[in-house]
Regions:
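Conserved hydrophobic ligand-interaction patch in extracellular adhesion modules
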Residues: 180-240
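Extracellular/periplasmic catalytic domains that process cell-envelope and extracellular macromolecules
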Residues: 125-127, 172-177
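Extended acidic/polar, glycine-enriched regions
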Residues: 120-156
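An exposed tryptophan-centered "aromatic clamp" motif
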Residues: 75-79, 84-101, 215-240
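Non-catalytic protein-protein interaction scaffold segments in large eukaryotic complex-forming proteins
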Residues: 2-58
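A Trp-anchored, charged/polar loop motif used as the substrate-binding/catalytic surface
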Residues: 152-170
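Long, charge-dense tracts
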Residues: 48-93
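Residues that flank catalytic or metal-binding motifs in active/ligand-binding sites
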Residues: 19, 84, 130, 158, ...
Length: 240
């Protein structure tokens, strides 16, 4: 992933005569967006232009010179669920010097906090580093997991374009930003293993629907099971 660079002139005189030395300072840039890296290598790995098994997704909306908001729809994630999170891997700036405002759109909130990342799936060389962690919150049905006929829950308005801005904690100046477009929202049923018909009825009662194969990324087309973990789905058209 290429990054932009700042060139500053150093006006110090040297013995050979008057000369300005160029000091190349990397500008703050988001290099990768890291979800859970389990099942992200070998036969599960994505295209090299999109995915690094040790770092996560490459940012698609940035080139050598600038950020392109019109390409936010190519960035990760495009789907979300309550309490899911991912990390922004940023270079060229002290993460602890950044502050982020939460963004709420269509009933979904993206909140960024600076955390020390020690998740078990993070490579050893990256553990303990401070990262900007993005958590999504929105409609969920935790208090109705055990109810076979739950009450309807809120439906987010999709799609929504989120732009997260990291600002200097002292000056409030914009330092770095990241954008993505959420097109789908999932609601899960925890550890409840039920038949397809039971899960279908549960989802429909919520006002959602069961996802189809084409709604899921990387899903095999030939799974066979008598009982399923509940996961309901709403797409950008609100379709059921």
């Amino acid at each position: 992933m290429s990054s932009s660079w700042n060139v500053q002139a150093n006006g110090k005189k040297v013995r050979a005569g008057n000369r300005s030395d160029a000091i190349i300072i990397p500008s703050p840039v988001i290099n990768y967006v890291r979800p859970n890296l389990n099942f992200g290598d070998d036969e599960y790995a994505g295209q090299a232009s999109l995915w690094n098994p040790d770092k996560g997704f490459l940012v698609q909306s940035i080139d050598f010179e600038s950020i392109h908001p019109e390409l936010y729809n190519l960035n990760f994630p495009t789907t979300g669920m309550h309490n899911l999170y991912f990390d922004l891997l940023i270079t060229g700036v002290n993460i602890n010097k950044l502050t982020w405002e939460p963004v709420t759109l269509g009933g979904i909130t993206a909140t960024v906090t600076n955390v020390v990342a020690n998740d078990r799936w993070i490579p050893d060389e990256d553990k303990g580093q401070v990262v900007a962690r993005v958590k999504l919150t929105g409609p969920e049905a935790r208090n109705q997991w055990y109810n076979p006929h739950p009450n309807p829950i809120a439906k987010p308005r999709l799609p929504q374009t989120f732009e997260l801005v990291g600002r200097d904690i002292s000056t409030a100046d914009e330092v770095v930003k990241y954008g993505f477009v959420l097109k789908q929202w999932f609601v899960n049923r925890g550890d409840q293993l039920k038949t397809y018909s039971d899960q279908l009825a549960w989802c429909n009662s919520l006002g959602y629907r069961m996802p189809r194969i084409r709604d899921l990324t990387g899903m095999a087309t030939h799974f066979q099971t008598k009982k399923l973990r509940g996961k309901c789905f709403l797409n950008s058209t609100g379709g059921k």
